[in-house]
Amino acid sequence: MKFGLWTQYGALNSKPIFAALEKGITSLGHTVDYNTDDCDIPVIWSVLWNGRMAPNEKIFKTARDQGKDVLVLEVGGLKRGTTWKVGLNGINREANFGPDGNGPERVQKLGLELQRWNTFGETIYICGQHDKSHQWRNMPPMSQWVLDTITTIRRTTSRKIIWRPHPRCQLSGIEHEFQNVIRQQPNKIKNTYDDFDFDTDDAWCVINWSSNPATQALIEGVPVFTGPESLAWPVANKDLSTISLPFRPDRTQWLNDLAYTEWTIEEISEGLPLKHLTF
């Protein structure tokens, strides 16, 4: 099988991950070419159709229209700068990361640990994401989504709300339209596209459509409300009407499976994520 690595449209931090993937691919007996459509499996960096990665959108859509799978690499959220997402046709729950029902081996290897559910938090966090991402397609403008979300929350509770925009997708002034809603400006975390750099000790819940803040919140013991494409969906709350009494399920199996969505550079070079994807 021939993999086409689109390195020219990768993020600046993507070079070592592409290099590791090439080693992993060839170790399994497959072949590699660069920046070409003449391949069985295109490999792109991220599904953020913006900046230097914008051309990946055409590559992705053309391949999918042709019935080809697309291998997507992306910054990880479990161990920043250490683990990297490797999935087919996406980076969230729409993607194929291999079989579910996994054991705890990778959770233990990565040193992941579920924190107890936080039942004493007071603040509702709404975490935005980049609206130029494939993850946000078919969604309303980010500003409308935030306004609708706050309006829905206010039908149930007057709790303090903190709105945190994605560091690369700013929205101004939204918080001024409501009482007890404030903005918390995230600092961009080096080598990531997420904004989960805050202390969740006072968090009652986190609302996030389909990006990293929801999965990180769950690990830290904070209930989440997400869309169906979120990797947090299996253990997330689905309806904001229950925000005063959020669901706090067992997260053990969920974390076991989540650990198989991200891999270290060494593991990628050994072909382990490809083996898990049954290549």
Feature names for model-found ranges:
Residues P223-T226:
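Short hydrophobic beta-strand element within catalytic cores of glycosyltransferases
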Residues F3, T83-E122, P234-F279:
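Leloir-type glycosyltransferase catalytic cores
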Residues S14-L21, R52-K58, P140-T152:
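Well-ordered, non-membrane alpha-helical segments in soluble/globular domains
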Residues M1-S46, N50, S133, K275-F279:
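N-terminal pre-catalytic "stem/leader" segment of glycosyltransferase-like enzymes
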